[in-house]
């Protein structure tokens, strides 16, 4: 029903609540213990109605008569948490001018803290006749109530007890990229009702697993409220990854263990509190580059119907269409002050109210586009830099998008760290035996100073990874040359075709013991390389137990056993898990692998005989320019001087660690290595050997001794005398 008379009824429905003017800010629905303030920004609106939905789905419409600076608002006493609501925005529907107001659509609150229900795809969600030839024709005005989700007023009060962020320094951080459902859906020790939920991720068995891997931060794939788009649903698939968000303040409701409206908020907070108690930070993968509304043929859920030109980048020559730097149909307009405010308010909310510790920005280059080009001095970066809250948490960029000039690895500002795609590519190429990779490999192993030093950043700015959610798992990287994405319903056209992978001789599953042994060794090689590299390592969930997606490198739509972690692999691949734990423990125990400053390649103190780092040939002498120029060399020994760490510790004290020698052999045959002269060390002891299933080695050698490094393996030696 609809009425302009607060507190009265027209006889066809319940009496409308009392309405007070309220405040323009904060935006969204804010409960204060006595009532709720509602506010919505729309510059194009001519009229806005707040719609309250009762338990039976009956709607009461309340005009928002107060407008300050294009913010429509009201305060309703006695409106309490659990109240479902939405907005109807009256204004021009003129696609040629970029305007798409449609009051037949119940619009979700851009600042909604929780959402309830689900979407039913059909004419009701679209502001054009889906059967018409011209999608710009007058909309059919089919009401979306009952076919769309509803926003929910939440209770903001929560007992955080003594919660504190671990605030782990970057150089001590080990990131574990995880999916809330995929991580927990099949774990036998998690109660069935908690599997696939925030509560499941906070279960002691998951926390113990992370602690045993020495993980200090989980990077959660999108948990902002997202949509399962109609194309996937028609194929019997789902938007598993979650990169199709529309609720930047709300934890995805399907990851809550109960379906009670608003329950996801408290459950998410409880998860964060539990992880913090275990010393684990929570980083969110956030998608502020686009929304779930898609292109001009997409549904009208919220932003499109509220103020299309404010929230989206439209084509200059034809405002009916959307600029798409993301491959999803639209791009958020981060140049508009209210859209920038939305993003910054969202980031602050998750830090202040939800206690998260950082963000990984999906396709971050899109946020930096001012006109068309990526600009590292864009308004978005300026706002982040000066924000007293957001600037103090971990900020990680995925430094590319699909637009021209979008690949920006190494070009983000000083506060930021970056997914180092060049590290991933180089490590993969080196271990699969590609020629002319040794020099590049050396740069990536030592923190990628060529990418980050010029902007005043340190090795930790490089988020090093070999695998992530997007692409092959580590097991598949050594088992498949080609993608096998037929299950995605796109005739294997989707996903990256150039994976820098090597199947070790047979495509996919095999019983050949030699191939299986080689694959296992290659996985250990990349694990160990990641853990001895300068920078911040990131692990993809399940790689520690050899998770496989059977060659599918794009499981964005596979909410099934294909993408979930198979916890039975803990027993089947126990050796790999033991090796992974050993490698991460080695890194944790030795600061020489996590230096705060780049190597200088020189002696650090007068009188020192050796440099802070030295590159040696298998014969034990230092590498020359000619050695680096030999394209087919795949062997190198790296001396890391633990007594030449220049950055002091947190108390200003000198940092001293053991020295190490890393012997890399990516050839397909064993190679004899000669230990360097006694100026480096008189005696060395083996610490980690990728040729052994669990990394064990019983080896002690002295200066100038000769020993063999097996084909395609890495040997880590520690100076003991």
UniProtKB/Swiss-Prot annotation:
SUPFAM superfamilies: (Trans)glycosidases, E set domains, Glycosyl hydrolase domain. Keywords: Glycosidase, Hydrolase. Its EC number is 3.2.1.-. The record marks 470 as: Transition state stabilizer. GO terms for molecular function: glycogen debranching enzyme activity; hydrolase activity, hydrolyzing O-glycosyl compounds. It comes from the Bacteria. The active site is at 362 (nucleophile), 398 (proton donor). GO terms for biological process: glycogen catabolic process. NCBIfam families: glgX_debranch (TIGR02100). Belongs to the glycosyl hydrolase 13 family. This is Glycogen operon protein GlgX homolog.
